[in-house]
Amino acid sequence: MKKILKPYLIKKKRFVDKRGFFQELFLQKENKIKIKFTALANSRKNVIRGMHFQFKNKQTKIISVISGKILDVVVNLKKNSKDLGKIYYFTVNEGDSIFIPNHYAHG
């Protein structure tokens, strides 16, 4: 039986010293997904972005917060899913990430 993936919060350890910090954002062996590309975006405080979803070339995503925090809303769009339309709310703090499977929209 194929495992159904759901979105989840990823907490990573941040190593801090007088120079700043170091933190791993992604490890293949921990996440078991293939990375096709990476991107970086910056949003100012109180910005609301639209829901993001790719219909033809679906993308599994890991959204990481470098500084500050975000509220990310994630919606299941998988056809014939018993959870179709289910909404998840994630408060993602500085240094944390969320995993979003390819059949979910987020924003």
Indicate residue ranges for each PLM-predicted region.
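Conserved metal-binding segment of the jelly-roll/cupin
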Residues: 91-107
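Non-catalytic, conserved peripheral segments adjacent to functional cores
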Residues: 1-92
